[in-house]
Amino acid sequence: MSAFGNTIERWNIKSTGVIAGLGHSERISPVRSMTTLVDSAYSSFSGSSYVPEYQNSFQHDGCHYNDEQLSYMDSEYVRAIYNPSLLDKDGVYNDIVSEHGSSKVALSGRSSSSLCSDNTTSVHRTSPAKLDNYVTNLDSEKNIYGDPINMKHKQNRPNHKAYGLQRNSPTGINSLQEKENQLYNPSNFMEIKDNYFGRSLDVLQADGDIMTQDSYTQNALYFPQNQPDQYRNTQYPGANRMSKEQFKVNDVQKSNEENTERDGPYLTKDGQFVQGQYASDVRTSFKNIRRSLKKSASGKIVAHDSQGSCWIMKPGKDTPSFNSEGTITDMDYDNREQWDIRKSRLSTRASQSLYYESNEDVSGPPLKAMNSKNEVDQTLSFQKDATVKSIPLLSQQLQQEKCKSHPLSDLNCEKITKASTPMLYHLAGGRHSAFIAPVHNTNPAQQEKLKLESKTLERMNNISVLQLSEPRPDNHKLPKNKSLTQLADLHDSVEGGNSGNLNSSAEESLMNDYIEKLKVAQKKVLRETSFKRKDLQMSLPCRFKLNPPKRPTIDHFRSYSSSSANEESAYLQTKNSADSSYKKDDTEKVAVTRIGGRKRITKEQKKLCYSEPEKLDHLGIQKSNFAWKEEPTFANRREMSDSDISANRIKYLESKERTNSSSNLSKTELKQIQHNALVQYMERKTNQRPNSNPQVQMERTSLGLPNYNEWSIYSSETSSSDASQKYLRRRSAGASSSYDATVTWNDRFGKTSPLGRSAAEKTAGVQRKTFSDQRTLDGSQEHLEGSSPSLSQKTSKSTHNEQVSYVNMEFLPSSHSKNHMYNDRLTVPGDGTSAESGRMFVSKSRGKSMEEIGTTDIVKLAELSHSSDQLYHIKGPVISSRLENTRTTAASHQDRLLASTQIETGNLPRQTHQESVVGPCRSDLANLGQEAHSWPLRASDVSPGTDNPCSSSPSAEVQPGAPEPLHCLQTEDEVFTPASTARNEEPNSTAFSYLLSTGKPVSQGEATALSFTFLPEQDRLEHPIVSETTPSSESDENVSDAAAEKETTTTQLPETSNVNKPLGFTVDNQEVEGDGEPMQPEFIDSSKQLELSSLPSSQVNIMQTAEPYLGDKNIGNEQKTEDLEQKSKNPEEDDLPKVKLKSPEDEILEELVKEIVAKDKSLLNCLQPVSVRESAMDLMKSLFPMDVTAAEKSRTRGLLGKDKGETLKKNNSDLESSSKLPSKITGMLQKRPDGESLDDITLKKMELLSKIGSKLEDLCEQREFLLSDISKNTTNGNNMQTMVKELCKPNEFERYMMFIGDLEKVVSLLFSLSTRLTRVENSLSKVDENTDAEEMQSLKERHNLLSSQREDAKDLKANLDRREQVVTGILVKYLNEEQLQDYKHFVRLKTSLLIEQKNLEEKIKVYEEQFESIHNSLPP
């Protein structure tokens, strides 16, 4: 480029003029096209210019660019064209300047877009690109219409071909210089042009270049400001080529054009319109050209101006092109770079611009006629070419402004619109109307102004024509310091300068205004784009503020939109208004930030985000660093009232729920969660809080009980045990379910005993707890006052949420009433001995708390609904029933029943002996009866201490006086201790032998079997409870009588009597001993039946118990049995649930096993795995809400049916039971050797085989009953499934089905893992120093693996629990209360029956293995 520029410097001005005359405007401009209409400022800002950015060659002085804009100009090419060495002596420069209309000549190949532009005198500003194009077109027009006199010499210039074809070579340049004088000689000027026309046909035919030209003859003088500018602002898509349609239009229009040309006026060099020889010659040349175009249609048509105003041709490669003069212009004179660019543009059909300005005002009617014909066709042809990007506004202007006269200067003004140039539009303040107003204004003043401007432009053109005709010396140089406007002013001074002054003033005012605005826009654009990315541009309103404030958050960017309608009006405001509005926006922006942005949290909240999850789970146990700040310490709590403590805990819970709540939860959901959590929390904690009733507190003080603060300390320590911790975590996490009670039962049994607290302290603590719970009970606070706190507390912990609330409401009040009555009744007349013994027992009983006994949880509340008298009678039984239910929940309920049976069957003398111990209990029993928590163990003097507790509660009711608070405590404890003591004194074997020795061994044996079942116990308990109602039941006779009366009175009595007989705890035992021994079997049967019917009611969920009295009595009996079991075992034993009361058969089996193992060590491993099964069951019950009564129901049914039809199996009844045994076992039994010739050990093995065979038979029967129950439950499940399917949505029904299906899978998996794990643990427990290290390592590895697998399975269980909650929530929407209870019962029963089935199968498997091993060990 620079080399080419240097070469151009050697050209003289005449050559420059010739080059200008060769029609640069018609030349293809590969670099800059219509896109120069796009403001450079906008292009640099938006980065969306349509072509590569090239600088304009130069800017004339009329543009008045200051130094800041000079960087946009190309000073090198300015010097190249306007050579400072040339002097304007003969006016050649002025001619050229006037010809070019104060534009720039794109000599270097950086051609500006081919736009006909305004003269400098036009009212409106014109861009340099437009001026340049206009100059070149004007030059070509003048050359065409030169002096007609010289046209006759047109054949004499053959060497111009070389001139046209060799411009790029130095010789070509020299030839240009040689031809200068000829070119500008008046005599030769028109000859050259004529020669061009003459050579056109040959050149076009040789090179195959097609040019369609329809209206050259219409190119008279060019007055753009007076012409309708249909395409003024258009960037023509078809600028690169003539579309087919346009080509057709040209052919069609030729005839019309020719006709027009014949009559059209033409302008001579003097500016006059003539129709002479010259015009006819020109027409002839054009006709020849048209013919040549038709013949060689393979060329490229670049652009066509249907009105003939200006032409731009797109030549083929290296082919000369024909300009409007008829001169051949070869594109090769451009440098190599530009030619390469042009080639690429041609191949891609890139933008080639045609700018059209019609000559309506000058050419007159003929031109108008042709314009009207071609206007629509050309518009279509231009628009159909979509290869070039178009500006939206331009296409609109084509349609809207066809009939309006718009000066070229409007182009830039209207380009700055919100649609096409939004950024410049905003930078200009939205005030483009100032530019557009003159254009659209049609008032007379404006029109006069436009006419004046048109005249001025015409005058300028006349000047340039006259100057062109004047000869100039070759050495004439352009003056360096003269600008275009200055040259125009020179001519103005010659002419008088009047029109020049008008022209300059109008031009300067508009140009200066435009330039100033452009400066501002450029500055803003540069400032914004120099350091901003497009995707990070500042929001537009900020540009009105010199120093916009820092934006605190990203929301600031979202606060404004560049597309809103309000924005446009905002930009038209003044600076002050913009600033003020921006300030307002700032404040609004801050508010928006608070809503949608990042939320700032306090340090305390931030700590919460990183708090330990395990701490969050402890709602009422321990403090967290910040959440418990409001809660007082234990020391301070003593000084606080109960209401304050509860209020603080409620506040903590609410705050914790708020902080832990998920951000994506709605406020309504959070409130609901908080409410639910609060309800659960209150349910759990109610029992641990003291009764606010002052009367109760006075009673506590009179009783010498520790105050609530002491008890709270005790309870907190108790809860610190692992079992309670686990339970509370479950509760706090909301994952606790109906089986929580079961879990905590087992945990609690082991937990309480190790506490090692004194019995008095524990007992007092228990009572305190109950006091707090009692306040919630039925109407009578008196009765509520006497309730046993320990029972309520345990109940609240162990039972399900529903159970807990229910127990707290009913049971606690009953216990309260009992305590209150107990206090009154302590003074009740009774055996002094009993009172003393009661006191003595108090110490013992305190040694064991209710928790230790495991019966602390009292579930029965139904009795509270009865009258106060009934409540008194029921108190003891109710408590016991709850305890019994608790035992029922625990896996060890069977053991308790067995123990109770043993006690019941225990020798009468033992009962008397127990009486000595329990005697005080009886007297205390009156007290105990008053204390609901005290065990209703004394039912009669005859019965062991356990019996006494049962009767004691009735007696307590009879004895309203409560003389000695200590007594009531003692009685409570006594009840437990006497029962346990009696049990300890009476070996299980003794009890069994007694049962057998009694006339009722079979029935009682059955009863013992029933004792496994929870219900029979309950029945027995119920009966004693009824007997308790008799006030003076201390004497065994009285108790038995009362019991008998109650039996007759109530339907429950027969049940209780039956149950009681086997249990032997209650007054029924007295009846059994004296009156009703023969009756017992019947009662047992009926009680069993009642049990079966009431089993579901006596399930873990106390609320479901159908018969409250019965349930309570049963609970009391169970509690007694538990106490006995625990005493027989050691209070410290944690595995009470594992250790069950053993029936006589079980004891016989154990004795046989011991004897056999002592003599045959080979059977040791197979005969001692029974504990594994129990441990597995315990593990399962800790995970699932076992409906123990329902599970036991099937076993009980089998035993009851057996009791009805036949006596208990005898040791030798092996063959009788063989019918239900597996065929393999039956075959072994039939093949066993004769006992006569066998030694002692073999006989024992034979006996053990028979025992195991009978066990297997029983298990098989139980399995049959269990399968029938499972079948029934499955039927219920199918009915439930059908109902759910009808009511729920398909996706909800699918969730329900998935949950039910996965429930069985998870239960089976957990049971299998638990069984395997317990087996491995048992094996590890037998490891000693003699065990192989490899075997030990294998056991450890298996244990670790199974433990991890079981933990994973527990995670599955946790997930299953969550899904259960979801399903329950779904069903709540569709099912009524009864249906919902049916669903819950179905799920619980399904789980319980499934676990029981697995347990039975495991038992049968174990017994079969034992049977086979023993049989194999027998001699042949």
Curated annotation (Swiss-Prot):
Domain ASD1: 518-620
Biased composition (Low complexity): 559-571, 787-798
Domain of life the protein comes from: Eukaryota
Segments of skewed composition (Polar residues): 225-237, 943-956, 1049-1060
A GO molecular-function descriptor: actin filament binding
Record note on quaternary structure: Interacts with F-actin. Interacts with scnn1a.
Family: Belongs to the shroom family.
The protein's name in its UniProt record: Protein Shroom1
Lineage, uppermost ranks: Eukaryota, Metazoa, Chordata, Craniata, Vertebrata
Gene designation per UniProt: shroom1
